[in-house]
Swiss-Prot record:
Keywords: Cell inner membrane, Cell membrane, Flavoprotein, FMN, Ion transport, Membrane, NAD, Phosphoprotein, Sodium, Sodium transport, Translocase, Transmembrane, Transmembrane helix, Transport, Ubiquinone. The chain crosses the membrane at residues 23-40, 56-76, 129-149, 164-184, 268-288, 297-317, 322-342, 358-378, 381-401. One of its GO terms (molecular function) is FMN binding. This is Na(+)-translocating NADH-quinone reductase subunit B. The modification FMN phosphoryl threonine is found at residue 236. PANTHER family: ELECTRON TRANSPORT COMPLEX PROTEIN RNFD (PTHR30578), NA(+)-TRANSLOCATING NADH-QUINONE REDUCTASE SUBUNIT B (PTHR30578:SF1). NQR complex catalyzes the reduction of ubiquinone-1 to ubiquinol by two successive reactions, coupled with the transport of Na(+) ions from the cytoplasm to the periplasm. NqrA to NqrE are probably involved in the second step, the conversion of ubisemiquinone to ubiquinol. The gene is nqrB. The keyword Oxidoreductase does not apply.
Amino acid sequence: MGLKKFLEDIEHHFEPGGKHEKWFALYEAAATLFYTPGLVTKKSSHVRDSVDLKRIMIMVWFAVFPAMFWGMYNAGGQAIAALNHMYAGDQLAQIIAGNWHYWLTEMLGGTISADASWGSKMLLGATYFLPIYATVFLVGGFWEVLFCMVRKHEVNEGFFVTSILFALIVPPTLPLWQAALGITFGVVVAKEIFGGTGRNFLNPALAGRAFLFFAYPAQISGDVVWTAADGFSGATALSQWAQGGNSALVNTVTGAPITWLDAFIGNIPGSIGEVSTLALLIGAAMIVYMRIASWRIIAGVMIGMIVVSTLFNVIGSDTNAMFSMPWHWHLVLGGFAFGMFFMATDPVSASFTNKGKWWYGILIGAMCVMIRVVNPAYPEGMMLAILFANLFAPLFDHLVVEKNIKRRQARYGK
């Protein structure tokens, strides 16, 4: 008996009146994970499209894979380089034996030595990322299913995207219990309390990260959380620039200068999904081509960032090195590219109108640079900029609609 036939045979037990009626949401989630729902349109009007919500979410899920795989490779490579820089011989062996990520990597055929292969680096990075992703997926999925059972509606595939986005924007060293707590806040407080998918006004993944940032700042910011090496501390590129400008950008392990190309490719420490602008561009091209993400929002973010960063460059400052950061460095450092492509373009929390999307994107780009430059306590600004713009998105749409109504009334003399 095939899986599809099995699911069809037991479906009646989960339908209204069946003995497992209350578990319909769980059954439906499992069934639609593998197969397209068998629902058809029987009454007019018929609106047909080859891409439904499930396929949209799955395509976004696939679009972050380039950044995810590169991020795992980079996290493993950064950790191995740092470990071999600090330890050697028996001391390194003791460190490996005392950390389950390290010894699991070696048990699976990898190595932590300085000449580790790309496979070993990928494997070590996976031992950090995959447990976080699995924790986020299971805990967040539990809350999704629970609310669907209580409300008696289907499980939405949107959580596939929320879970992987959240896992990609946290440090690789984040404790698993904090990952569970963060996604709980994002799903329950930022989404389900307001009615679930389609009714939330904040991006759930960013809301969960913001909760962790303010509740547990030591585990999600600072200098010790970005490189997965025991005892290693190294400032991020944004923090280095804030301290001494472009000349202060150095690899914290080798001491070599960090070039723009290093940052663009992703050879720097950071969150798994945020380090490689190149990998993010590949994924962004997919979702823009399929019209899942709005090019207007992306262009607006770039315009806002370029204008404000150039303005700060012109003003200049003798005491704040961030004033000198040009727009092309803002693009490749921190979470700017990830936020612009995959967070700002969230179709639920972003503006709906075309003109509103432009203003929404411009606000994000401008606010991100302003937070980075003016706020000395917080070198990164994309997360707060997007959440701030989420609050204004309905206002932008309202103003656009009101202006359109007035223009049409004036046109027809009403």
